[in-house]
């Protein structure tokens, strides 16, 4: 029961967990503050230890002392002593347990290796067989997993190499086609150039021959040759338009034939 100015307040455990935690935090801070003020103002050595409901430790110790010094001084002053716990029995038990575990591990290792099975009972051998089969299944599963991973890596590598091979093949084919097209174009240009040069040569040779040698005059019974006709055709095809040639009448070279009134011989 706490008596305050406005009335009496009953002190009891706060049932609400949240309210209890908030109250604990506020009261703890106030208690630590008052303890510090008392230590400073009155030069008192104070050691305050607080454990929360969850087991969390809060403490305060007057400077420059430590909590262990204050507790030792308390024990000396009161004549009390801390109980010394004999841990030898507990240590013996732990050592014995470790020895048993080590022996069991050694026996299990020997049985797994098949070194000493003379003292093993049927149940122990059956259990050992199950354990070995289980371990063997795990080993096989892991081995299969590694093999599958290697196969996947090999497939990826194969696909990558196939793609590189396909790209290289396409590049070679395109390069070969380009070379063939370039060679064909060069050959065609050379052929056209050769034909052009041959035509020019023929025209030059034709220009050097007399023009009248390609015609047959009156009274000549010899028919023109095929080469003459071809030359004449080429001259006709390559000659300039008629309107660009000035009219010119061919005249025989004999003086008697140059008369405009030429008559044949008369026979009376």
Swiss-Prot record:
Molecular function GO labels: DNA-binding transcription factor activity; protein dimerization activity; RNA polymerase II transcription regulatory region sequence-specific DNA binding
GO CC annotation, single: nucleus
Chain ranges of the MADS-box domain: 4-64
Species of provenance: Petunia hybrida (Petunia)
Subcellular location: Nucleus
GO BP terms: positive regulation of transcription by RNA polymerase II
Function: Probable transcription factor.
Gene name in the database record: FBP24
Protein's name according to its UniProt entry: MADS-box protein FBP24
Lineage: Eukaryota, Viridiplantae, Streptophyta, Embryophyta, Tracheophyta
